[in-house]
């Protein structure tokens, strides 16, 4: 029987085969006509890839059926170069935890009364308990 093989370029090849022929035999015949090695060939019929050990009858390929030939892709993606940096990485600031840090905002005098050492922010957005920073000439909230 005669079958057609459509290549990637759109060219159609006719092959003389039997329904008992294996896919390996068909690929060998394509190699004779086109020069493409069988290990690079992928034959597709009715949306399925044809496996090498099977016959044409297994896939219900009849006379004047059309197979599609595509080439197998080898390997993965292109290897990427490792980035080289010209400047060294910036070191991050380390947060120093000060034990009982709240004590720096208050002072207990001789009579046992607690006094604030820093001024609280008068801004309504900040809320109670937000202290202003002491600069040599001013107090600053940051907002």
From Swiss-Prot:
BP-aspect Gene Ontology terms: translation
Mapped zinc finger ranges (C4-type): 121-143
Residues annotated as domain Ubiquitin-like: 1-76
Cross-link named Glycyl lysine isopeptide (Gly-Lys) (interchain with K-? in acceptor proteins), sites: 76
Cross-link Glycyl lysine isopeptide (Lys-Gly) (interchain with G-Cter in ubiquitin), where in sequence: 48
Single GO term (MF): structural constituent of ribosome
CDD domains for the chain: Ubl_ubiquitin
GO cellular component terms, A-Z: cytoplasm; nucleus; ribonucleoprotein complex; ribosome
Keyword line: Cytoplasm, Isopeptide bond, Metal-binding, Nucleus, Ribonucleoprotein, Ribosomal protein, Ubl conjugation, Zinc, Zinc-finger
Entry annotated with the keyword DNA-binding: no
A Pfam short name: ubiquitin
Family: In the N-terminal section; belongs to the ubiquitin family.
Miscellaneous: Ubiquitin is generally synthesized as a polyubiquitin precursor with tandem head to tail repeats. Often, there are one to three additional amino acids after the last repeat, removed in the mature protein. Alternatively, ubiquitin extension protein is synthesized as a single copy of ubiquitin fused to a ribosomal protein (either eL40 or eS31) or to an ubiquitin-related protein (either RUB1 or RUB2). Following translation, extension protein is cleaved from ubiquitin.
Protein name in the entry: Ubiquitin-ribosomal protein eS31 fusion protein
Species whose genome carries this gene: Daucus carota
């Amino acid at each position: 029987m005669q079958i057609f093989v459509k290549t990637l370029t759109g060219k159609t090849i006719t092959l003389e085969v039997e329904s008992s022929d294996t896919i390996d035999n068909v690929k060998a015949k394509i190699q004779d006509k086109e020069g493409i090695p069988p290990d690079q060939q992928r034959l597709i019929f009715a949306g399925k890839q044809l496996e090498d050990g099977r016959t044409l009858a297994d896939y219900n390929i009849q006379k004047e059926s059309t197979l599609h030939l595509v080439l197998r892709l080898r390997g993965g993606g292109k290897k990427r170069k490792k980035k080289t940096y010209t400047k060294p990485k910036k070191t991050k600031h380390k947060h120093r935890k000060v034990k009982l840090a709240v004590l720096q905002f208050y002072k207990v005098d001789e009579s046992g009364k607690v006094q604030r050492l820093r001024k609280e922010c008068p801004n309504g957005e900040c809320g109670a308990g937000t202290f202003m920073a002491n600069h040599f000439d001013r107090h600053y909230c940051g907002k």
